[in-house]
C-alpha cells in the first residue's frame, strides 16, 4: 500500500507524461480541470494509467467526483486499504 506522498508523486508523473505539466505543479489542492487544465480525454488516460500503476479500479461514475488531485489521492489510498 502506497503512502499519500507516494500516490501524489505517482499521479504527478502520470499527469506529466500525459500533459507535459511539471510534476511540481501537481499539488493536492489543485483542480484537474481549472488549475491543471486537463480535459476529459486526458483525464480518462490519467485514470487508466493510475489504475495500472496503483492496482486499483476507479469506476467511471467515480471519475466525475475526482475534482482535485487530493480527491484522487484519497480515492486511491482508500481503494488500496
From Swiss-Prot:
Name its cellular compartments: Cytoplasm
Could you name the Gene Ontology cellular component terms for this entry? cytosol; membrane
Which InterPro entries does the protein's record reference? ACP (IPR003231), ACP-like_sf (IPR036736), PP-bd_ACP (IPR009081)
Return one Gene Ontology term, BP aspect.
Answer: lipid A biosynthetic process
Key word Phosphoprotein present in the record?
Answer: yes
Mention any Pfam family matching this sequence: PP-binding
What superkingdom does the record give?
Bacteria
Q: How is it modified after translation?
A: 4'-phosphopantetheine is transferred from CoA to a specific serine of apo-ACP by AcpS. This modification is essential for activity because fatty acids are bound in thioester linkage to the sulfhydryl of the prosthetic group.
**Involved pathway(s):** Lipid metabolism; fatty acid biosynthesis
PROSITE patterns registered for this protein in UniProt: CARRIER
Which stretch is the leader sequence? none
Xref: Gene3D superfamilies = ACP-like (1.10.1200.10)
Q: Which residues form the Carrier domain?
A: 2-80
Q: Which residues carry this modification: O-(pantetheine 4'-phosphoryl)serine?
A: 40
The UniProt record lists the keyword Lipid metabolism: yes
Q: Which GO MF term does the entry hold, naming one?
A: acyl carrier activity
Checking SUPFAM superfamilies in the record gives: ACP-like
Q: Which residues fall in a coiled-coil region?
A: none
Mark the transmembrane ranges: none
Q: Provide this UniProt record's keywords sorted from A to Z.
A: Cytoplasm, Fatty acid biosynthesis, Fatty acid metabolism, Lipid biosynthesis, Lipid metabolism, Phosphopantetheine, Phosphoprotein
Q: Which PANTHER family match?
A: ACYL CARRIER PROTEIN, CARRIER DOMAIN-CONTAINING PROTEIN
Write out the similarity annotation.
Belongs to the acyl carrier protein (ACP) family.
The UniProt function text for this chain reads: Carrier of the growing fatty acid chain in fatty acid biosynthesis.
Could you identify this protein by its name? Acyl carrier protein
Which species is listed as the source? Arthrobacter sp. (strain FB24)
Amino acid at each position: 500500500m502506497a503512502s499519500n506522498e507516494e500516490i501524489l508523486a505517482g499521479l504527478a508523473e502520470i499527469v506529466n507524461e500525459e500533459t507535459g505539466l511539471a510534476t511540481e505543479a501537481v499539488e493536492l489542492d489543485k483542480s484537474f480541470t481549472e488549475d491543471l487544465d486537463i480535459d476529459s480525454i486526458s483525464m480518462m488516460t490519467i485514470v487508466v494509467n493510475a489504475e495500472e500503476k496503483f492496482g486499483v479500479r476507479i469506476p467511471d461514475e467515480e471519475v466525475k467526483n475526482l475534482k482535485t488531485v487530493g480527491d484522487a489521492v484519497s480515492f486511491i489510498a482508500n481503494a488500496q486499504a
